Amino acid sequence: MDIRKSQFEENIWYLLFIYSEIAAALWVHIFFFEITLRDFIDTKLQRRYKRLDWWNQPGLLSKREFLQIQRVLNRSNIDELKYQVRTLLPLSFWVALLTKRYFTKVWLNLHLDSLCDGRENFHLRANEILALRNLIAHHREISSRNLIRDHAYLGELTAILDPELAREVEKRSRVLDLLLNARLVGSGGGI
């Protein structure tokens, strides 16, 4: 009985190591997607509104998003124009700017429609990535997710924003090899 228990525990530890490696490999993709998305939106809105502090454009942001920026600025005690505020805002802020509420004020100014299959699909996929990011960041279980789909979404969205960067990230990625290894182990998860 002790032998079975130790074998069972060994299998559990092995799966935990595989999934932690997959999470680490996915984090590289998430990192590049997050910085690419925030830089892309920030740059486009700076150009559109001809100001570094585009969030102060009257009527642009909802009260919630505006207060989120104000909290970040107050907490950081910085001069908002001398610092890149975009680096302090969470991915959830940038994904919120892709919602239907911001269709005219943000989405149309990003000029992404010709590059992707619409705001709704882009937002849906970005929201899936946000959920995956939060699971990984909080050391939660990811084995029940469709990780192949998540990996594809990361590649697709990053390629829309910066095709060259997406190719470089994919060239160095270990995600698919790790996912294949996890499948061979027969984890029974959502891979």
Region locations from a protein language model:
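Amphipathic alpha-helical interface elements
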Residues: 1-191
